[in-house]
Amino acid sequence: MSTCTFVDKKGTICGRNNLTGSEHCHLKSHYDTEIEYKMAISNVMEEFKEGRIPANQFLQSNVEADGACLFRSVANAIFHICGNDLETLFERFEASEYYQMLPKAVKDGFLLEYRKLFENFSDPDKFLDDEIETEVAIILQKMAVRYTLAKSSVDVTETMEGIGDIFGPSCTLQTFIETTHEITLDEYVSLYEKFAGEDDYYLKEKEVVIRRGHKRGKQVVKKVKVDIQERWGGLPELLMYAEMFDISFNVYIPQRLDNRTMKPVIAKKVCENTFYYLVQQINQNKGTNVVNLSLKEVKEGPHYEFLRPV
């Protein structure tokens, strides 16, 4: 990339990278005329828009950032997909490999549980209310654990773009889970039985000795917090849901142009100048249904949102 040749009063050459199609950088004072500057900015904006989707083409689900955001987002996505044709969805699920692999003794009960996902759904053009969203998210997390138990040895390199570049020509679901979450498969199954939206600790009774005051030396029982690992959902879980529900996932990050540098940056808030940039595809061109998700960093950590087309 060429650099800005503007020379200041001291004879110092700017040297910053030029804007696309321009002979100067992002600083307005380095242009001979305001028209030249505006044209340069316009060119940068047009280049930025290429390959990105305007944020106003989606509505964001605005799920809670409580560790269960992926499960909540997928719950809203399934709600949107199923529309009012629930019977077709149930028929497809009964015929799916996921349902067929379940032990015969649990099939009927599991189908009832699956139906519970949708029993209160009414308007697919709205997002789920908080209570139903949580119920569905809990079931979805349990489904991921069951899928893991049955399909841990399955090769997943063809389901998600880029896995082969990291793990080589072959990668099992177990390897993908253990590498992503940095725990063993047994630890994953045990840990993810507890809903991700619940507290990341439990209270344990502990005997302690009072060291100060008039009760000094007396032994009492107190409740203390014991931390447990977070149970967030990520790419392994998206891969599972892609197979379960016949979905192709597109994961986007929200971006905007920085007003100072005119370079793309992550947008903390979605506004009219926000665009979505595709960073990951799962089950590309294979799923009957396409689901778009947003991924951004918030105070609590990485955060997923379902993006419903307007």
Task: Briefly describe each language-model feature range.
Residues 1-50:
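Intrinsically disordered, low-complexity regulatory regions of eukaryotic proteins
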Residues 8-9, 243-244, 254-258, 283, ...:
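Short, flexible beta-strand-to-coil junctions
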Residues 24, 59, 70, 250, ...:
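Beta-strand cores of modular interaction/reader domains in eukaryotic scaffold and signaling proteins
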